[in-house]
Amino acid sequence: MEFYKSKYTVNESPVYVSDNMTGKMAGVPAISTSVLCNTFCAARRASGDTVCAHCFAVSTMKRYTKANEHAEKNAALLMNRILAKELLPIFGNVRFVRIEAFGDVCNVTQAVNYAHIAKVNPGVIFGWWSKNIRIIARAFDQIGGKPENIILIESSEKVNVEKEPSSPYVDKVFTVYDKKFIKENAVEINCGARSCVSCQRCYTKGTEAKVHEILK
């Protein structure tokens, strides 16, 4: 078992933390698995009417093979067993962490591991994006509820179609719209910042429950 230490963590852990995110995610540490080994993601990409058909993570993981290697190792580690507390990453001077920047949760074991990571880092906000809310809800039920420092964001599966939260655990819904639909329906885009660090809308409770982004 390999151990890693991120510039954002105070300990070594077999869970790899991405600490060199770019674009709007610059400065945000992330714990991710790979879209390339996710059967849920593959099935949704095959359906042309989903936002997954436009997935940026596929090209990113294919281009950055080392990053994909770490993400696939995270998948194997997090999906197959509940990790002992001493194996979980402990974050230092960090305000928030992204869960799943390049994939999605696949099973309850993985979701429980993410919840445990949040529990051992009570001073950090974890923004968790997912389309597989049922899996996460089962994990939260199993551990006695959602940790208070997790903001669960349900991603709408289709472009231009905002879904309703599928669980009481969901804090926000994230929907992507194309420019034509935005213009014709006067959709307010409130995720347009060039920096998640400066915006923080998705990592702050009490802000808008519906987050809208332009399709890239």
Where are these regions (language model features)?
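Class I S-adenosyl-L-methionine
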Residues: 1-216
